[in-house]
Amino acid sequence: MEVDAERGRVVTGWGTVAAWVAGALAFAVVVFVLAGAERVWGLFGPADLGDIKFETLERRSSPNDALAMPEGFGAARLDMTNPVYAVPPQALRDAFGRALAGEKRLFRVAEDEVALTARYVQRTALLGFPDTIVVRFVAVGPERSSIALYSRSKFGYSDLGANKERLERWLVVLAREVPPVK
């Protein structure tokens, strides 16, 4: 510690600043661990980002979302085109529910039986960041259906591909329940 004799005050160096920053960071980590991720992120509003309309969806400018839909279903830029399944939409919805049974940190927050839509929140493993996933089951012909999926992060500019990986994983486990026809 140095004292500035002319001004009569203590001069702090970078070591003191670094100590304060380290202390503040340690305090934040302790609060995060003790309070839990859900409570901490809850301070920034609900985890669920709400519903969307696939037909009029406008994608985010940041790379922290992913969209997968049947061919010709909407105008937004797709990350992947979803296949067609040889079952009606209700049966596809039931198979989807079975397929997701093993997903960790996944919570259904809304469901519309008539519109055949559902909304989920899934939290990341390490820090518990919430992502909202909207699902819609659509008829694409007699006894044929497909699925529209939109996954988006609540926090951050980039998700490092996590939302797209989630949708790809979900489509793989759904195909084990109901094999696609095309």
What are these regions (language model features)?
Residues 3-23, 31-182:
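Ser/Thr-rich, low-complexity intrinsically disordered terminal regions
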